[in-house]
């Protein structure tokens, strides 16, 4: 493909798209330029047919340190495994694209977004969504609807598209929206207790900009787009599916009705076994005209296919029943939340713990408090920073009664932990008010849907139990949607369980306090939803959230005044930055003495003069702070001090003119003798004395008079 360049013209901040220059073994690759940010997107797909019952799409987002003119800080000085930020960004892009592929398409696709140049004032994920969509759109892959994403902030009473870093710092709203010309397909947001109304306004505002980016992509497609590949449907499989549905449709519909009306869930397994047994009898016949025999592997694949056909038919009948009858499999009403149970203080040694159970979903949240020096160090394209609040989400296989591998956290675990972390963060106290690093681990002990929102609830209660002065309690809820694509009839479900999530069309997670929303995430399995549906889901979620908060407040309504006896005690105080060297001393001599003399107390000193002192005993902390304050205090005229003689002042002839008395490393003054002496009979070096400050000149030099010698 020849090099071609396109540029958005009707947008305030223009994107430039270059096609046909880079990565020419890929067809196509797209280079996006926006405000010094450059992202290369490549798309490759396999012609091999797969028997997957899902779309094997892999999206990778990677940042190169050279993009910001930096050398990696790792030992090897090169990029390593994906960071949490890269994983979360990959998930964002994936969630924006996946709903728009035809359900029948099953060929493997890999989309890679590489950040080659980075402007810290612009979110590279926005360029990556645009590049990924455009790359797929102009390829022969059956991807027909362009998608685009924008970031929205709220600055000085107005919404701002793709704000810079400074604007984001001052915004109560951080919203990323992806959508097509017609609908929104993905939302990711965190906020400082923002109302549902503001969120909805921001989404509408974002969608107007998204439409323009989608139209731009369509214009590019008309000029350079390839002919789309036809989806090669297996005629034999289609025939088998049609025959299967005709044979079992009515029985499956009756079975679904029995599950809903009479709670006959055992009938499902009996019916399924009956179908598989019948299929097994036919498994040796491969053709009609000539009898041949399946080998063992073919028999296995055939039975798996029949099982998948049954599950597909059953799921569709379940969906139809829920939409038509407005009923749920577990007999709840559409807005009803599952049974709730919560406890705190389950574990004696950790600094705080809480167990939150909602139906068959259960999260155990455990809090650990530490010094700020134990904060997580993040080194990325925007520079090095510290993260004092960490929430880690673990989903072991036993949570769903399975056997599985224990390995590094999965993308899903990282994503769920990040969502819960963002939900809690706005309610945490400021660093100066609560100078601790905080780590929360959520162990999912049972799971039947909405475990990330159970994590939010358990974390909120565990922090209060640990004595962390959380401003308000935070709860979360997951909302679902079932929509008939032919009639547009739909139902919205509150607090979805696993089955409803699996066969439904939407997973909308909303967390917040009684004052507003703090985190939001929406994923779809359909090509988008209207503003009306979104509005209904938001306010239905609010009702459920407040119900859950009411329950949580019965367990613990406010943070404890006292922390656990096993939690470290940290206090912070401020000194002048120029006094830091007096606390540290030459080669760390003084600070090491302070630590040694105060039972190994931990001391962290920041460049701005803040000092954090930590120990398990509060009295030890106070003694260390008092010692440091005395150490760096400034001298005052007429004040009396305990000191020691540190050295003498001599003239050129060697006569002793006076002696220097040191009170602390920052206070040293001169005791002047009435007349010069060859030999001093008043004091000796090392003598302990009591002195009075009588003068401090304009250069800060101190004069003492000797009161007495000890």
Curated annotation (Swiss-Prot):
Pfam families: KH_1, RNase_PH, RNase_PH_C. Its cofactor is Mg(2+). Residues 638-710 form the S1 motif domain. Mg(2+) binds at residues 501, 507. It catalyses: RNA(n+1) + phosphate = RNA(n) + a ribonucleoside 5'-diphosphate. GO terms for molecular function: 3'-5'-RNA exonuclease activity; magnesium ion binding; polyribonucleotide nucleotidyltransferase activity; RNA binding. Its EC number is 2.7.7.8. Keywords: Cytoplasm, Magnesium, Metal-binding, Nucleotidyltransferase, RNA-binding, Transferase. GO terms for biological process: mRNA catabolic process; RNA processing. CDD domains: KH-I_PNPase, RNase_PH_PNPase_2. GO terms for cellular component: cytosol. Residues 568-628 form the KH domain. HAMAP family: PNPase. Involved in mRNA degradation. Catalyzes the phosphorolysis of single-stranded polyribonucleotides processively in the 3'- to 5'-direction. Belongs to the polyribonucleotide nucleotidyltransferase family. This is Polyribonucleotide nucleotidyltransferase. It comes from Phytoplasma australiense.
